[in-house]
């Protein structure tokens, strides 16, 4: 089986691939993430996913399949990146407070012969966030390296009052669609089952 390389430094994506039992090797694939003029959010994330996969492919020897992915938080058509500082993070949380926004995650697979990619859009609804809550959340350190200034799988989960779409896509990798695409490249899931804590019935 052709080895799979993950062109991402995201620990969330590593955890998600491990969750579905797919063995992989992490590689670095830095790319210019600047949006192009008038580029739509779906086109932006899919272009970056493909660019990361292509950049990863040139750094490995022999047959390989490289997975690249990119996630963007979008509010009113505006892409919210990682906050630059405390003020930026608090402004993002204020904008997201009490509203719905979209999270777009694109995934690309590249084996040097073909490149396939897709984009999944999910809608996340936030409850109202007080100024004090936003300040305490920033102090936790979690928002500083997260697109949109929050992590749905972390402390930021308390802000989420609803979600339509793929939870795993919001975290960083839509597992259902990714598993299907991996299968098209001959890479099966459930090769190495992740450890699942035993659940004991308290009754």
Curated annotation (Swiss-Prot):
Keywords attached to this entry: Cytoplasm, Hydrolase, Nucleotide metabolism
Swiss-Prot/TrEMBL site (Important for substrate specificity) positions: 12, 71, 153
Cofactor(s) in the UniProt record: a divalent metal cation
Active site: 70 (proton acceptor)
One GO CC annotation: cytoplasm
Cited NCBIfam families: maf
Protein name listed in UniProt: dTTP/UTP pyrophosphatase
Database matches in Pfam families: Maf (PF02545)
Family stated for the protein in its record: Belongs to the Maf family. YhdE subfamily.
Organism this protein belongs to: Pseudomonas putida (strain ATCC 47054 / DSM 6125 / CFBP 8728 / NCIMB 11950 / KT2440)
Purpose: Nucleoside triphosphate pyrophosphatase that hydrolyzes dTTP and UTP. May have a dual role in cell division arrest and in preventing the incorporation of modified nucleotides into cellular nucleic acids.
Gene name, Swiss-Prot/TrEMBL: maf-1
């Amino acid at each position: 089986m052709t080895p799979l390389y993950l062109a991402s430094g995201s620990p969330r994506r590593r955890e998600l691939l491990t969750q579905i039992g797919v063995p992989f090797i992490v590689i670095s694939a830095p790319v210019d993430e600047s949006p192009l003029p008038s580029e739509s959010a779906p086109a932006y994330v899919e272009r970056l996913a493909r660019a990361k996969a292509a950049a990863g492919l040139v750094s490995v020897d022999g047959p390989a399949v490289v997975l690249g992915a990119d996630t963007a938080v979008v509010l009113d058509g505006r892409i919210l990146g990682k906050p630059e500082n405390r003020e930026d993070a608090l402004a993002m949380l204020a904008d997201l407070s009490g509203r719905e926004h979209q999270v777009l995650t694109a995934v690309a697979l590249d084996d040097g012969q073909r490149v396939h990619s897709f984009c999944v859009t999910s809608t996340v609804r936030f409850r109202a966030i007080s100024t004090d809550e936003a300040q305490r959340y920033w102090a936790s350190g979690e928002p500083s390296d997260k697109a949109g200034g929050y992590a749905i799988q972390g402390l930021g989960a308390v802000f989420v009052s609803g979600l339509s779409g793929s939870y795993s896509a919001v975290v960083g990798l839509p597992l259902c669609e990714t598993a299907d695409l991996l299968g098209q490249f001959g890479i099966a899931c459930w090769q190495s089952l992740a450890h699942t804590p035993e659940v004991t019935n308290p009754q």
